[in-house]
Design a protein with these regions (language model features):
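Glycine-rich phosphate-binding P-loop
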Residues: 1-19
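Compositionally biased low-complexity segments enriched in polar/charged residues
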Residues: 2, 18, 88, 96-99, ...
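Short, polar loop motifs at secondary-structure junctions
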Residues: 8-9, 83-89
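Conserved substrate/cofactor phosphate-moiety recognition/catalytic segment
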Residues: 17-71
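Short, charged, surface-exposed secondary-structure boundary motifs
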Residues: 31-37, 108-117, 155-156
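Loop/turn-to-beta-strand initiation segments
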Residues: 75-81
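Conserved phosphate-donor/acceptor-positioning beta-strand/loop module used by diverse small-molecule
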Residues: 81-85, 94-114
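Small-molecule kinase domains that catalyze NTP-dependent phosphoryl transfer to phosphate-bearing small molecules
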Residues: 116-158
Length: 158
């Protein structure tokens, strides 16, 4: 399994369409849907259902279920998969995975992406995550590149 990770709002969904890798958000949405509070309606109209009420417990269960979906999908299909920063030690997600490569797009492009979706107030948080993930990637021998094109080239060569 070859995996690209990228900080949120870096364009993984957009680039997956033009570069031919698979966006995990789409696979999960089609298979089991998303909890309504995750606001992922652009990926699926399905709502993830669970008897759990507590949002944290629901998120952890969804995390486990969504990883199972991706594991099954990649066992059946030879693809490059893109995931968000769920592999970080500071993430609540329960995905037992490390990416092969981390994409950190140009900071100005990242700010522009946030501006385009009216989320520019998130830049301080996103900037923190960018630095944190770069540090964790280096500690875990995960290749860091600046573009999705470079990530695809790296994965195809290794």
């Amino acid at each position: 399994m070859k995996i690209i990770s990228a900080v949120r709002h870096s364009g993984k969904t957009y680039h997956s369409k033009s570069l031919g890798f698979v966006d995990c958000d789409k696979i999960i949405g089609e298979a089991i849907g998303w909890p309504s509070h995750f606001d992922k309606k652009e990926f699926s109209d399905k709502i993830y259902s669970s008897p759990l009420i507590d949002e944290h417990e629901l998120a952890v269960q969804f995390s486990r279920d969504s990883w199972k979906v991706l594991e099954d999908y990649t066992n059946e299909t030879d693809v490059i998969l893109s995931i968000p920063e769920v592999w970080s030690a500071r993430s609540f997600w329960e995905w037992p995975i490390k990416p092969n490569v981390l994409v950190t797009i140009d900071e100005e492009r990242h700010k522009q992406n946030l501006l385009e979706i009216n989320q520019n107030h998130m830049w301080p948080t996103i900037k923190f995550w960018r630095h944190l993930l770069e540090h964790e990637a280096k500690e875990n021998d995960i290749k860091v590149v600046n573009t999705f094109e470079d990530a695809i080239l790296y994965l195809n060569e290794n």
